[in-house]
């Protein structure tokens, strides 16, 4: 099956040779081709270039993209799409003055989601989650990481990971699974934190590894949740079972989680709303991708990740949604890109790089996703007719997507 997309007004994120990520000043550079064509063979990008160099092609399908921008589908490297029910009451509680921490301390927050999840059947969780997955695909996401972390019991965590596996089997979107048993301490372990960590290490991880249910291990390293020492213990156990770490750090406090992530060669460190100079310094020259979650900052009215300082320091940065029922009930990467520009003062070029190639890196997919490169997955966004790609963050409330292709097929 050969598909030709022709007369593309502008083809974005064109990389003749594959790159893994972009950092620092390079993030401001977004290679493009104006008046372009793109050829898809089956599920892969086969060729692209300027229309004046279009070779003779016998295409099975032709898409005329006149006036439209084509770019790689978004790569959302941090989500909690699999959950039961919602936490809309907590949304109203916050409006009425309760903080995220206060809600958590009275049984809300993550523990509320855990209660709902453990009371809901695996089939029902799948049915609820697939609706959210289909929504983010329509919004232009072509690769997504999904975490567990609302089970907080052996069976609850396994149930979540089985749902993630079933979604990956039933949908063309690329899905990476992350085990986040260390999301919070269950109520019955509040006075026995070591006991819960032991359960994660001796009961959850062996089952997960044996059944190949996860690619990564995550920990919520934060005051009132998991300490640096506890985080390191769980990361090491995950590594021993073949799971690379990617961890939650610096959402509310800087307690040394970034340094621990780097020490254990974490694929990514995510949130980063609170960053001090030592945290930025610790990330320099490492293989660990910093990931910002601006929709979470928007929804909780907390600080935004200091993108300008980080990019100025030469760091790479990825953007993701943090789609979850409590702090970011949205999987819209278009809004993430716009919010990064508006609130974090990233340029459109930086934000698109962060949401494509750097997002792919943050879930181990940069060899196959995140750029227009021959041999990569044909996961694409075709916009509606727009004046330029600046419209994507500028018209932040508009749906500018005409078509989404995953594995070369319009969804």
UniProtKB/Swiss-Prot annotation:
Its EC number is 3.5.2.7. Zn(2+) binds at residues 78, 80, 248, 322. SUPFAM superfamilies: Composite domain of metallo-dependent hydrolases, Metallo-dependent hydrolases. N-formimidoyl-L-glutamate binds at residues 150, 324, 326. Fe(3+) binds at residues 78, 80, 248, 322. Pfam families: Amidohydro_1. It is found in: Cytoplasm. One of its GO terms (molecular function) is iron ion binding. GO terms for biological process: L-histidine catabolic process to glutamate and formamide; L-histidine catabolic process to glutamate and formate. The keyword Phosphoprotein does not apply. It catalyses: 4-imidazolone-5-propanoate + H2O = N-formimidoyl-L-glutamate. Transmembrane segments: none annotated. It comes from the Bacteria. Its cofactor is Zn(2+); Fe(3+). InterPro entries: Amidohydro-rel, HutI, Metal-dep_hydrolase_composite, Metal_Hydrolase. One of its GO terms (cellular component) is cytoplasm. Binds 1 zinc or iron ion per subunit. The keyword Lipoprotein does not apply. HAMAP family: HutI (MF_00372). This is Imidazolonepropionase. It comes from Flavobacterium johnsoniae (strain ATCC 17061 / DSM 2064 / JCM 8514 / BCRC 14874 / CCUG 350202 / NBRC 14942 / NCIMB 11054 / UW101). The lineage of its organism: Bacteria, Pseudomonadati, Bacteroidota, Flavobacteriia, Flavobacteriales.
